[in-house]
Amino acid sequence: MEESVNPTIQLGPVTFNLTLLAMSLLAVLLVFAFVYWASRKMTLKPSGKQNALEYLYDFVIDFTKGNIGSKYMKNYSLFLFSLFLFLVVANNLGLMAKLQTTSGENLWTSPTANIAFDLSMSFLITLICHVEGIRRRGFKKYLKAFVTPGFMTPMNILEEFTNFASLALRIYGNIFAGEVLSGLLVTLSHQAVFYYPLAFGLNLVWTAFSVFISCVQAYVFTMLTSMYLGKKINGEE
């Protein structure tokens, strides 16, 4: 994917990437539309679209419950389910199309292929984990985990920063790399007519592989979020 200047808007000292905002909103709307469509006219005996929605929900619960614990699982199940669905959609948006203006502005990309978005999302997840930990355990008991034993305090603080950074960089590296190679294959197909069949075939295979990787990254991000959250609300017990 070649470098391009995305359209932006300036609000005071803050610059907003309009492409990133639009694609993030699109991902949210797609998730909402899917859940709304699948949950309409729900019955006690699920089938079809309702069955698919419940399967996805149970899937998320199954791989996160061990980290959160049965005591608090019902409080965070919808949060984790929504996070997983959003990431599945957001990770794959950039693979669906390649849209650029004549001046090279990229108008279609995965939100998670942007490091600023991933760092912001990771920061928000970290903040939620800390806030929920304090709310569930109390400030004094929560703070004690950082200073007991005393010689581990620097390592405990460093761990918070490494968790925050790794959560963002892991998903960014995988999604961005997928879009870069996909973009290069599209560019190759434009070089000459005889390159097109090769580029098309390779891009088809790579897109399928990237969809798989994107779903795996959504799984990993949600799993790690549940691990961090479970550790904060349950302590080291």
Curated annotation (Swiss-Prot):
TM segment ranges: 18-38, 77-97, 114-134, 167-187, 208-230
SUPFAM superfamilies (UniProt xref): F1F0 ATP synthase subunit A (SSF81336)
GO MF term list: proton-transporting ATP synthase activity, rotational mechanism
Domain of life: Bacteria
Cellular-component GO terms for this entry: plasma membrane; proton-transporting ATP synthase complex
Membrane topology term: Multi-pass membrane protein
Gene Ontology biological-process annotations: proton motive force-driven plasma membrane ATP synthesis
Pfam families per UniProt: ATP-synt_A
UniProt-annotated location(s): Cell membrane
Keywords per UniProt: ATP synthesis, Cell membrane, CF(0), Hydrogen ion transport, Ion transport, Membrane, Transmembrane, Transmembrane helix, Transport
Membership in a protein family: Belongs to the ATPase A chain family.
Function as written in the Swiss-Prot or TrEMBL entry: Key component of the proton channel; it plays a direct role in the translocation of protons across the membrane.
Subunit structure of this chain's protein: F-type ATPases have 2 components, CF(1) - the catalytic core - and CF(0) - the membrane proton channel. CF(1) has five subunits: alpha(3), beta(3), gamma(1), delta(1), epsilon(1). CF(0) has three main subunits: a(1), b(2) and c(9-12). The alpha and beta chains form an alternating ring which encloses part of the gamma chain. CF(1) is attached to CF(0) by a central stalk formed by the gamma and epsilon chains, while a peripheral stalk is formed by the delta and b chains.
Protein name per Swiss-Prot or TrEMBL: ATP synthase subunit a
